[in-house]
Curated annotation (Swiss-Prot):
This is Large ribosomal subunit protein bL36. It comes from the Bacteria. SUPFAM superfamilies: Ribosomal protein L36 (SSF57840). GO terms for molecular function: structural constituent of ribosome. Belongs to the bacterial ribosomal protein bL36 family. The lineage of its organism: Bacteria, Pseudomonadati, Pseudomonadota, Alphaproteobacteria, Rhodobacterales. GO terms for biological process: translation. GO terms for cellular component: ribonucleoprotein complex; ribosome. The keyword Magnesium does not apply. The keyword Cell inner membrane does not apply. Keywords: Ribonucleoprotein, Ribosomal protein. PANTHER family: 50S RIBOSOMAL PROTEIN L36 2, LARGE RIBOSOMAL SUBUNIT PROTEIN BL36B.
Length: 41
């Protein structure tokens, strides 16, 4: 999982990427291709 300042560019890397808030943190998850996972902050 990558840790990034901005998730906007990561969201556009793959069409299945979703931005999700969990426990106050913002994550990018991808069910079909898990290597695109990322977290902000």
């Amino acid at each position: 999982m990558k840790v990034r300042n901005s998730l906007r560019s990561l969201k556009s890397r793959h069409r299945d990427c979703q931005v999700v808030r969990r426990k106050g943190r913002i994550y990018v998850i991808n069910k079909t291709n898990p290597r695109f996972k990322a977290r902000q902050g």
